[in-house]
Amino acid sequence: MATFVQHIVALVAVALLSMGGRAMAQEYPNPFVVEQGNESLVRTEWGVGVGGVYTGFGSISSDAVTLNSRLAFQGHLDMAVVVGRYFAVESGVIYERGGIDAEYRGKRYDITTTRFEMPLLLSLRLWDSMVRLKGGVQLGLASSGGYLDGKENYMFGTVTPTWNLAAGVGVSVMPNMVVELRYIHALQDGVNQLGATVKGAGLDFTTRTHKVMLGVSLLM
């Protein structure tokens, strides 16, 4: 959790520096912004959005466990440094909340998942940014799952690992609105557990996930 807080503090610091640079640019020339005609060669872009996420399990180390994801809700804050007309570096913070229907030894479990993630993507923008092709990594800052069995709460474990590959395409449907489809593939296994009781631990197993995200962002 401490690492996640550090990432958030760093992101806020970048935002404040960026806004401060904009305010200074209104009165003094900014040596870090190259003007090309009336358009800045380097500029920042901000956005907020929502979307849906489906998580698939490519592999499960135990045949005794069955996992089926439910559609998750996503909210995100987006930030990009745009260089010229065609290139950008994109980042942000993503919050996801969803669920998994699990079964182990004939018993069903309703697992609730919560995730915080940070994408780091390179973006190629075509046709005046109407189409945005992007790829890079998506970092899992914090990921947890848990379930209630009787009156006891138990931890399911990590759903999204730290390192994930990401690729996507965004389309501008309005001047300030972008719809994006993104695929995320985990590079690490998640460590999970089911069937724990007050008397002892349950079955330990690993999973490898992939995700499909569809979202809409409003640019500011």
Q: Positions of the model-derived regions?
A:
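Short glycine/proline- and aromatic-enriched beta-strand/turn motifs that initiate or cap beta-hairpins
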Residues: 21-80, 133, 140-146, 151, ...
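Transmembrane beta-strands of outer-membrane beta-barrel pores
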Residues: 52-58, 95-99, 126-128, 139-143, ...
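Outer-membrane beta-barrel architecture
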Residues: 76-78, 119-123, 168-170, 215-217
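Outer-membrane beta-barrel strand-turn architecture
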Residues: 81-85, 124-128, 173-175, 220
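Repeated loop/turn-to-beta-strand initiation elements of outer-membrane beta-barrel proteins
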Residues: 86-89, 130-133, 171, 175-181
